[in-house]
From Swiss-Prot:
This is Early nodulin-like protein 3. Glycans are attached at residues 57, 83. Pfam families: Cu_bind_like (PF02298). Confined to flowers. The keyword Protein biosynthesis does not apply. It is found in: Cell membrane. GO terms for cellular component: plasma membrane; side of membrane. It comes from Arabidopsis thaliana (Mouse-ear cress).
Length: 199
């Protein structure tokens, strides 16, 4: 009987470690919402960026016409001058994901300098996950953000991406509408089942 109880405790520890790992995952932000990464978005990318709060492990999803545009991660100076000659990172597949792997500022411009000069550029400030909650910021009375939680508790639940330019969905897998507990609810159910199996 002691061996079974030790195994159950070990299994519970492994599950809790797995739950802790999933909580560290971030959100997927659709850059530009329904418009995607375009030269003349319906909402300025600067405004879009300021309405959101980005944290380490979040992902930016750039959707654009493959072969007609691209996304370049650049320095702040290159961002300010729309200089496309020395990018830090170049994305060109038309459906690009960029992981925000550390806190600080990131700068993105179109691979077409003329598009950048028209406003197709994005600056993102990434906050540390340790000291800040993960919720959208609103600087103006705009429509409620449409988003979904990946696995950490945070902003209120939403629905699938719509016309709102503040759309966020889980990074992996198809979008589904979570309950008010987000994805922590299933983790709690597993934990309760595991604890009850000990008795």
């Amino acid at each position: 009987m002691g061996l079974v109880m030790r195994f159950d405790l070990y299994l519970m520890f492994v599950m809790l470690m797995g739950l802790g790992f999933t909580i560290s995952n971030g959100y997927k932000f659709y850059v530009g919402g329904k418009d995607g990464w375009v030269p003349t978005p319906s909402e300025d990318y600067s405004h879009w960026s300021h309405r959101n709060r980005f944290q380490v492990n979040d992902t930016l999803h750039f959707k654009y016409a493959k072969g007609k545009d691209s996304v370049l991660e650049v320095t702040e100076q290159e961002y300010n001058t729309c200089n496309t000659t020395h990018p830090l990172t170049s994305l060109s597949d038309g459906d690009s994901l960029f992981l925000l792997s550390h806190s600080g500022s990131y700068f993105f411009i179109s691979g077409n300098s003329q598009n950048c000069l028209k406003g197709q550029k994005l600056a993102v400030k990434v906050l540390s996950t340790v000291h800040h909650s993960h919720s959208p910021r609103h600087t103006s009375p705009s429509p409620s953000p449409v988003h979904q939680e990946l696995s950490s508790p945070g902003p209120s639940p939403g629905v699938e991406p719509s016309s709102d330019s503040n759309s966020r969905v889980p990074a992996p897998g198809p979008a589904t509408a979570p309950n008010s507990a987000g994805l922590v609810g299933p983790g709690m159910v597993v934990l309760v089942i595991m604890i009850s199996s000990l008795f």
